[in-house]
Structures are given as structure tokens and as C-alpha cells.
Regions:
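Carboxylate-rich, polar loop motifs that coordinate divalent cations or form catalytic acidic clusters
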Residues: 1-166
């Protein structure tokens, strides 16, 4: 992070390694609190251009984490597209050059989160023009020069999404 710490996602929470002190600190979910991690199993971590961490969890959606102040914002699954994720199982996350987030889910396809409008858009298998070949997303790669996202799926092969044209 911007403070020189190393963040490690595990099945048992988020761990911060302080290189100066050599000490670890563990962050786990607590069902009794509405703050903190939504789920302790961390599948992916992305540090955005502001230095904040986006954490993809297994069954807890996405957690936006400010490491300097240790503040979490939770993004969970929703039945309404604009309001949340299509699936709580998040395995891959990338940030585009506009600071927006692309979230690969297991079973819920690709989710786009517009940070300016705070709305989601879902790309699902078999859902018309913006569909992808399978809703189980295993890999994401962003090409900033061409503004293309490559989407690797389980059983559906490789998909190409030009984010300029949709």
C-alpha cells in the first residue's frame, strides 16, 4: 500500500505485513458487526490509483478498504442490477484507466462498477448483445491502450470486451 505495508489475502482473512516492524495484523469478518470484512475468505486484492484496496471475497462480495484509516465499504449481491453485484462470489477484479472497477464473479458473470455514478452493470451469459460466453469468470486482463478487457471463463473460453463501445 502507500504506507509500505504488504497485504495478503487468505482463506482466513486479510493480513497486513508491516515491513518496518516485521509484524502481521489479521483482519477477519465478524457476523456481529456491520463494519469490517463481509467474509474472511479473500480471493483477490486490487490497489486502485488512489491507494485504496478492493477485496474480492468468497460469498461476501467486494470490500473497499482504506488501509490508512481501516475503513470498509461493502458492496454485496443484489437482485437489482444497478444496486449491487450479480453474485457474492468474487474471484477477479481490475481497475480501468477511468478508475472504474470490473469484477469477475463465479456464476454471476462480469460486473462493471461505475465509481462516479455508484451504479453496477452486469454482463451475463446469454443476455443479448452484451452477453459473455459463460457466467463463471476465472481471469480478467485490461489493455489500457486499446481499452479492451479480456475475460477468461470456465467452460466458455475467452471473451473480448471493448469498453468504449460496450
Amino acid at each position: 500500500d502507500n504506507l509500505g505495508n504488504i497485504w495478503i489475502g487468505t482463506f482466513n482473512g486479510l493480513n497486513r505485513y508491516n515491513k518496518t516492524t516485521g509484524l502481521f495484523q489479521n483482519h477477519t469478518s465478524n457476523e456481529m458487526q456491520n463494519e469490517g470484512l463481509t467474509h474472511s475468505s479473500i480471493w483477490c486484492i486490487v490497489k486502485d490509483n488512489q491507494g485504496t484496496l478492493w477485496l474480492g471475497t468468497y460469498f461476501g462480495g467486494v470490500n473497499y478498504f482504506n488501509p490508512e484509516y481501516e475503513i470498509y465499504t461493502r458492496y454485496k449481491a443484489s437482485i437489482h442490477e444497478k444496486e449491487g453485484l450479480s453474485s457474492p462470489v468474487v474471484g477477479r477484479t481490475i481497475e480501468d484507466k477511468n478508475g472504474n472497477l470490473w469484477i469477475g464473479t463465479e456464476g454471476g458473470g462480469l460486473n462493471f462498477y461505475n465509481r462516479r455514478t455508484r451504479e453496477f452493470k452486469w454482463y451475463l451469459a446469454g443476455q443479448g448483445r452484451n452477453s459473455i460466453s459463460h457466467s463463471n469468470v476465472k481471469a480478467l486482463y485490461y489493455d489500457p491502450a486499446k481499452e479492451i478487457i479480456w475475460i477468461g471463463t470456465h467452460l466458455g473460453g475467452l471473451n473480448k470486451l471493448d469498453i468504449r463501445t460496450g
